[in-house]
Every structure is written in structure tokens, then in C-alpha cells.
């Protein structure tokens, strides 16, 4: 049941693009799925490599940003950031931390 619940949460966040909301809060997800903080944390620990909620959402945002830069090279970095729920400076910082290059460097190699 727990894995199914995590997959339902993950699918909803991705399909409905909840990750793109700048003000998305853990409480929004908890309320929507009728679970408490501890239960959500347990799900993330078990099925999202132990990531915290902000880390989990950022990982989805970064994955989507990378996909957008590949599939829509005409988009500016600011456009990509807006579409995935980051500010441009935050996308730059988080992207570099995860992938070892800036979004601009990544785009230049595509």
C-alpha cells in the first residue's frame, strides 16, 4: 500500500505539474492525500532515496528542466526556470549542484 501511495503522489505531482508551483508546500501534498508529515517523510525515505520533500521536488524540477533544454532548445534559461518552478538564479545553482555544469553550459553542449 505504501509504495502504491507514493507512486500515486509522484504521478500526481508530475502529471498535474504541481512541482512547477513556486509556493508548493509539503502541507499541500499532505492535505491532498490525507496523510501526515511523518507518513509523507516515511514514504520519501522509502521510495525517493531518502530525500526530504524540498529535495524531492527539486529533483523533479531539475529532471524536467534538463528534458526541456533538450526538447525545446529555443527556450531561454529564464523560460525553463519559470516552467519548472524555479527562479533563474535558483535553477542555475541547483542545476550546477546536481549535474556539475550550469544550465547555459548544458544547453551549449546540446
Please place each PLM-identified region on the residue numbering.
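Basic, amphipathic alpha-helical hairpins
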Residues: 10-24, 44-48, 66-75, 95
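The alpha-helix within a helix-turn-helix
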Residues: 30, 41, 80-81
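A secondary-structure capping/hinge motif
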Residues: 44-52, 95-106
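N-terminal positioning helix adjacent to the helix-turn-helix/winged-helix DNA-binding module
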Residues: 1-9, 25, 58-61, 73
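Residues within helix-turn-helix
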Residues: 27, 38, 75-78, 89, ...
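Terminal helix-turn-helix DNA-binding modules in bacterial transcription factors
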Residues: 47-83, 109-110
Amino acid at each position: 500500500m505504501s509504495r502504491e501511495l507514493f507512486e500515486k503522489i509522484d504521478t500526481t505531482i508530475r502529471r498535474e505539474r504541481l512541482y512547477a508551483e513556486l509556493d508548493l508546500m509539503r502541507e499541500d501534498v499532505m492535505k491532498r492525500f490525507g496523510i501526515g508529515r511523518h507518513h509523507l517523510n516515511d514514504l520519501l525515505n522509502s521510495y525517493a532515496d531518502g530525500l526530504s520533500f524540498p529535495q524531492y521536488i527539486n529533483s523533479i524540477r531539475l529532471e524536467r528542466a534538463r528534458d526541456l533544454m533538450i526538447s525545446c532548445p529555443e527556450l531561454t534559461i529564464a523560460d525553463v526556470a519559470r516552467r519548472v518552478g524555479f527562479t533563474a538564479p535558483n535553477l542555475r545553482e541547483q542545476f550546477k549542484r546536481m549535474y556539475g555544469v550550469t544550465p547555459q553550459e548544458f544547453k551549449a553542449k546540446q
